[in-house]
């Protein structure tokens, strides 16, 4: 053994060939600060070997290296600039030393080689891979860019256009594409990976493969003349700005950095990469996107704990074949859980099956499943007009019309037909679960399971715990939702649960703004372009449906009369009273026609202004700052109340529910990350300017207390001593 640490071993393999093996104690290899420090020492041990002829890098795990340890990022990014630069320089010096070894080097890649893992293999002369690999640089998805030489070596290895495509989009690619563009040199069966890599290394040692020629382009400027350079980068910058937009600076920064470094050799180009990386790492966008990644991992970890407690249902039933019921049945079947879809109408069943067939056909056309899988999936949805066979179901999801009496009757009837340990779940968006449970003999087996429309696209499922719901029931529903490919988040029962409860105050704030003379078109523009919502509030209400929004207002007003009751008619009431229901009937805040693809196209409608003029003050010109404050403060306050009341268990779960359920702008990271960025004291000070507008704008006491103590809702991670990799 030439060198050994907790994560890396270096030993002689044969005939002057040494192997450096990544072998972390955990299930996967990460390039955390400890491993980087170990890699420094491992390379030093190789540099001292006089008989060294070649070096093989490989992994003992099912994946090569999945990337850096993202749990360390927020602490690293909060370091002083000089510390962050020191860490990057130190890390890059290690990969330079791999690249500068006086012998040929090769990486044997299996599984994932992402981020720092990809940058590691780029530093070797050759790369051989198994067919199952995914390799790429996903950093821009985290609001940063490659920092270990990826933006320098990749374009010099595979060409500027190919590299920009991977780096700017944060892409990873498979073995076939990686071989085609030159990122890897060979694809071999997994069982022959190491032998093939050694054989290739022996060819290089013997002089049959020119390893110096393979290495040289990575040390030099890009092979582009001035005209080619201008064309490549101008096209890339235009595409990136169109796709990423102004709120996500990482992709365009990466492109500009590669452009600036195009005429530099490796060492100067790496300095440029570091100079571009550091400002990105210290942006609020990077903190938000890294926060989303960490929160997502946390939420998935909670779901895994539930999975340990129960068996995933193997057969399900869905009651109701409408938009939601049909979508739930499709998603269940698509993910391998056969499902019985029951309705009282043959026409509804046919519509449900047709919708499933249409979605499967789209998957088939995109090459995501073959004809056999498509047919098998469709045949695993059993449409029926009666309950025969429902006793086989381990879980039944009720998705009938949003009427408490009908839902209670259907659930009560179903309970008499299923096994005693069968779990019942109601897909409701507004009806309290504890109320529905009163019609059941086994309320402990019942909970809410709130899907979002369209079911096949929206990642969130709210799992609602009623007063008498058992933990086994919650775990079973979480397991089922996870198997369906969804992100389940458990919330406690209350009117609107979590997502709809916090959405309505946002819409009420919008209504107050209209009452005071705001223009819904300007508000939509500000909330989309400046704040970053996928849809402004008026457009969102049209998509939801004004009838649905009107009903939701009524339910929430009963549940929270002090904040959400309105003793006057607002915009939603007026448009609803005039049969303007939004996209569903072509008239809402906007009017809708169909485009060439048959999709709703939004247009202005003077009649809306005439109707709103009856309840709204004369038009006023609000600033973007005022519009954002007046719509967002009610939502932020309500989210905080939900945490304080225990409706939702943690800031991480709240933020993920907002991002996955409402499309809260990811670059803000969710309400609690947004509060952290602004600072709790600054938020309270801002909100106090609007306190005169009513109860919705009153800051919850817990948030005020945090502001007084200058506390955040997220704890700070341990700081990292970058030179040693030890936590401080």
Swiss-Prot record:
Entry's Gene Ontology molecular function annotations: 3-hydroxybutyryl-CoA epimerase activity; delta(3)-delta(2)-enoyl-CoA isomerase activity; enoyl-CoA hydratase activity; long-chain-3-hydroxyacyl-CoA dehydrogenase activity; NAD+ binding
Cellular component GO terms held in the UniProt record: fatty acid beta-oxidation multienzyme complex
CDD domains attached to this UniProt entry: crotonase-like
Residues the entry annotates as binding substrate: 296, 500, 660
Keywords carried by this UniProt record: Fatty acid metabolism, Isomerase, Lipid degradation, Lipid metabolism, Lyase, Multifunctional enzyme, NAD, Oxidoreductase
Binding site for NAD(+): 324, 343, 400-402, 407, 429, 453
Annotated site residue numbers, Important for catalytic activity: 119, 139
Pathway: Lipid metabolism; fatty acid beta-oxidation
PROSITE patterns: 3HCDH, ENOYL_COA_HYDRATASE
Segments forming a coiled coil: none
Function of the protein: Involved in the aerobic and anaerobic degradation of long-chain fatty acids via beta-oxidation cycle. Catalyzes the formation of 3-oxoacyl-CoA from enoyl-CoA via L-3-hydroxyacyl-CoA. It can also use D-3-hydroxyacyl-CoA and cis-3-enoyl-CoA as substrate.
Subunit structure: Heterotetramer of two alpha chains (FadB) and two beta chains (FadA).
Protein name: Fatty acid oxidation complex subunit alpha
Source organism: Photorhabdus laumondii subsp. laumondii (strain DSM 15139 / CIP 105565 / TT01)
Gene giving rise to this polypeptide: fadB
């Amino acid at each position: 053994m030439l060198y050994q640490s907790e994560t890396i071993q270096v030993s002689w393999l044969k005939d002057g060939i040494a192997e450096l093996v990544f072998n972390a104690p955990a299930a996967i290899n990460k390039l955390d600060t400890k491993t980087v420090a170990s890699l420094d020492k491992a390379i030093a041990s190789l540099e001292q070997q006089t008989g060294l002829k070649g070096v093989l890098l490989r992994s003992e795990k099912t994946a090569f290296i999945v990337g850096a340890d993202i749990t360390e990022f927020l602490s690293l990014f909060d370091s002083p600039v000089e510390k962050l630069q020191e860490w990057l320089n130190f890390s890059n010096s290690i990969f330079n030393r791999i690249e500068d070894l006086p012998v040929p080097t090769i990486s044997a890649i299996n599984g994932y080689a992402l981020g720092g893992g990809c940058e590691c293999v780029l530093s070797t002369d050759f790369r051989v891979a198994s067919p199952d690999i995914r390799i790429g640089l996903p950093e821009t998805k985290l609001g940063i860019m490659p920092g270990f030489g990826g933006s320098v070596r990749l374009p010099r290895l595979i060409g500027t256009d190919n590299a920009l495509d991977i780096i700017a989009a944060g892409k990873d690619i498979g073995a076939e594409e990686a071989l085609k563009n030159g990122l890897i040199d060979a694809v071999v069966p997994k069982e022959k990976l190491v032998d093939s890599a050694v054989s290739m290394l022996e060819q290089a040692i013997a002089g049959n493969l020119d390893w110096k020629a393979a290495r040289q382009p990575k040390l030099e400027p890009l092979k582009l003349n001035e005209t080619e350079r201008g064309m490549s980068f101008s096209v890339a910058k235009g595409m990136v700005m169109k796709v990423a937009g102004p709120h996500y600076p990482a992709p365009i920064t990466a492109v500009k950095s590669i452009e600036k470094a195009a005429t530099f050799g490796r060492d100067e180009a790496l300095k440029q990469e570091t100079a571009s990386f550091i400002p990105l790492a210290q942006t609020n966008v990077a903190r938000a996107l890294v926060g989303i990644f960490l929160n997502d991992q946390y939420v998935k970890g909670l779901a895994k704990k539930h999975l340990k407690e129960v068996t995933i249902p193997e057969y399900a039933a869905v009651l109701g074949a409408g938009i939601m019921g049909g979508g739930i049945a499709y998603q269940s079947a698509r993910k391998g859980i056969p499902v019985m879809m029951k309705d009282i109408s043959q026409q509804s069943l046919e519509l449900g099956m047709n919708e499933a067939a249409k979605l499967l056909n789209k998957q088939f056309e995109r090459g995501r499943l073959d004809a056999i899988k498509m047919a098998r999936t469709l045949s695993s949805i059993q449409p029926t007009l009666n309950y025969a066979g429902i006793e086989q179901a381990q879980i039944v999801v009720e998705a009938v019309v949003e009427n408490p009496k009908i839902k209670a009757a259907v659930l009560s009837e179903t309970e008499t037909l299923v096994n005693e340990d069968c779990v019942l779940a109601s897909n409701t968006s507004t009806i309290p679960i504890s109320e529905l449970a009163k019609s059941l003999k086994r309320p402990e087996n019942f909970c809410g399971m709130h899907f979002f429309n369209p079911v096949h696209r929206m990642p969130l499922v709210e799992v609602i715990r009623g007063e008498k719901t058992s933990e086994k029931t919650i775990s079973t529903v979480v397991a089922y939702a996870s198997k369906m490919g969804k992100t389940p988040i458990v919330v406690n029962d209350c009117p609107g649960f979590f997502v709809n409860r916090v959405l309505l105050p946002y819409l009420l704030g919008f209504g107050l703004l209209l009452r005071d003379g705001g223009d819904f078109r300007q508000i939509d523009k500000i909330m989309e372009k400046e704040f970053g919502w996928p849809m402004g509030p008026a457009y969102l209400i049209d998509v939801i449906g004004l009838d649905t929004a009107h009903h939701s207002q009524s339910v929430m007003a009963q549940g929270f009369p002090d904040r959400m009751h309105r003793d006057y008619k607002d915009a939603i009431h007026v448009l609803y009273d005039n049969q303007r229901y939004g996209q569903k009937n072509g008239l809402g805040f906007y009017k809708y026609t169909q485009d060439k693809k048959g999709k709703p196209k939004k247009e202005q409608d003077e009649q809306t202004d005439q109707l709103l003029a009856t309840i709204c003050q004369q038009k006023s010109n609000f600033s973007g700052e005022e519009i954002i404050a007046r719509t967002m403060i009610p939502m932020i306050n309500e989210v905080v109340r939900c945490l304080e009341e225990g409706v939702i268990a943690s800031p991480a779960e709240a933020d993920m529910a907002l991002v996955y359920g409402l499309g809260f702008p990811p670059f803000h990271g969710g309400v609690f990350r947004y509060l952290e960025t602004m600072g709790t004291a600054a938020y309270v000070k801002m909100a106090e300017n609007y306190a005169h507008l009513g109860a919705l704008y009153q800051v919850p006491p817990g948030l005020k207390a945090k502001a007084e103590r200058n506390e955040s809702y997220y704890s700070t991670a341990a700081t990292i001593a970058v030179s040693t990799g030890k936590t401080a």
